[in-house]
Curated annotation (Swiss-Prot):
An annotated GO cellular component: cytoplasm
The protein's name in its UniProt record: Tyrosine recombinase XerD
Family: Belongs to the 'phage' integrase family. XerD subfamily.
InterPro entries: CB, DNA_brk_join_enz, Integrase-like_cat_sf, Integrase_catalytic, Integrase_recombinase_N, Integrase_SAM-like_N, Recomb_XerD, Tyrosine_recombinase_XerC/XerD
Length: 309
């Protein structure tokens, strides 16, 4: 039995209100999405209540072409799913045309990126505190934090990879770290001179502590067994950021990992190399940084093209 789109929408909204107790805002949102889809399809001679999968996909494609966010497209599809399930359950349709449609993928937010200047301020503050700490307990923690930061910014390690480094990696070739990442995949990452120096200063003091010979971790937790917890590192990092005059809320181990990748790309590294250094199994994961490449290419053309504005 065929039903006009407008009547079908009213019946659906009445059911949502009476049987499911949907809030007024929810009902209005459903109405807007369903009426917009009905109007678009009517202009093409299609009754929304009789629409097929291709028609529904077309309305979503139109939204995308008009610049609607994936969240708006997903909301529209959700309303249509509820609508067609209602028609199916009431016997007005023999199928649900939305059943095989996937929700539009949400765009990954661009990572927060610290400027080179702010990373420098953070590292300088860590170095200052490592040099000035006099009390033994404070000195070892300050040296550890400085070594952690220099290593993180030099390598872009995941925080779990960083705090879980075995001490043996610092006793072999000091120019590289052998890192075991996700899926137990190993990769070699180079160390900067500053990172090697900070690690060596920390390691010298670490090795002088009682029981250090039996501790397998490069960055041990001094108050308990095991390695430094990533939550403790994140907390110490935020405290350091505040002392360096930076907004603590904008600084985290993950933000520094993003800074490592972005600063490499800004200075000429290619995406494939950055993928290998970050330990991404798929290049698509690294492509969140393509905006950095686009900015670099735009700048390159602007500076070197003879007819650029």
């Amino acid at each position: 039995m065929t039903m006009r789109a407008s009547l079908a929408i009213e019946n659906f909204l009445e059911m949502m209100s009476a049987e499911r107790g949907a809030a007024q805002n929810t009902l209005e949102s459903y109405r807007r999405d369903l009426e917009a889809a009905a109007e678009e399809l009517a202009a093409k001679g299609v009754n929304l209540a009789e629409a097929e999968t291709g028609h529904i996909r077309m309305t979503l494609d139109t939204m995308a072409a008009q610049g609607f966010a994936p969240t708006s497209q997903a909301r529209r599809l959700s309303a249509l799913r509820q609508f067609f399930r209602f028609l199916y359950s009431e016997g007005f349709r023999q199928d649900d045309p939305t059943g095989i449609l996937d929700a539009p993928k949400k765009q990954k937010p661009l990572p927060k990126i610290m400027s080179v200047e702010n990373v420098g301020r953070l590292l300088d503050r860590a170095a200052l505190e490592a040099n000035e700490a006099a009390e033994p307990g404070e000195r070892i923690k300050a040296l550890r934090l400085h070594a952690l930061l220099e290593t993180l910014y030099a390598t872009g390690l995941r925080v779990s990879e960083l705090v879980g480094l075995p001490v043996t990696v610092a006793r072999t070739d000091h120019r590289f770290l052998l890192v075991r990442g996700k899926g137990s995949k190993d990769r070699m990452v180079p160390l900067s001179r500053k990172a090697r120096d900070a690690l060596q200063k920390f390691l010298t003091l670490r090795d002088s502590l009682p029981g250090s010979d039996d501790n397998p971790w490069l960055f041990p937790a001094f108050s308990e067994s095991g390695h430094l917890a990533r939550q403790v590192f994140a907390r110490e990092l935020k405290g350091l950021a505040a002392r360096a005059g930076l907004a603590a809320s904008s600084v985290s181990p993950h933000v520094l990992r993003h800074a490592f990748a972005s600063h490499l790309l800004q200075n000429g590294a290619d995406l494939r190399t950055v993928q290998q250094l970050l330990g991404h199994a798929d290049i698509s994961t690294t492509q969140i940084y393509t905006h950095v490449l686009e900015e670099r290419l735009h700048k390159l053309v602007s500076e070197h093209h003879p007819l650029a504005d």
